[in-house]
Amino acid sequence: LLPSFSPFESEEEGNLLFCLSVDDAFRWPVTGEEVGQFDCGGNNFGVYRLPDGSYQFEICDEKKALCCYLQANADFSDCRAALVAESDAGRKFGLNNALMLVYAFASAPYATLLMHASVIRNDGRGYLFLGKSGTGKSTHTRLWLSHIPGSDLMNDDNPVVRVVEGTVYVLSLIHI
């Protein structure tokens, strides 16, 4: 479904940040207490919390169509998703967003923050352009590429900012 993610697939047990299994027949037996409904650029994420500290998410696209159910334990190390969209595009959307959510929460204890930004690299530094979708982040990035020598595109959607021993790094993750 997401060929660009295939290098990260692993059957090995070990020191993994998280495990996300996909089972389209999965449904939770009980819905947790609603934490909130969050508008994410026109998409909606319903978030619920169970008494044991685990989380449930309903990931909907911009048309409010349900694409994915996601359940995660309290530290997001063990997660299950059901891709319920009818179209391949909806299933990809659901899986991509489930992976981003799980990564963001599972990596947070390691001083990381998944951002919605476009990043230019120049002279060994990363410059993040932040803003809502459609506000010109990628346009600004293209202007740097065209007019500022030595610039290259590091990531055009979801970079990760990480602090290691007081130094801030920007990292590029894969994107569909």
Functional labels for PLM-detected ranges:
Residues G136:
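Conserved glycine(s) of the Walker
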Residues L1-S133, L143-D152, V160-I174:
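A noncatalytic interaction/capping subdomain that flanks phosphate/NTP-handling catalytic cores
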Residues H140:
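Hydrophobic positions on the alpha1 helix immediately C-terminal to the Walker A/P-loop
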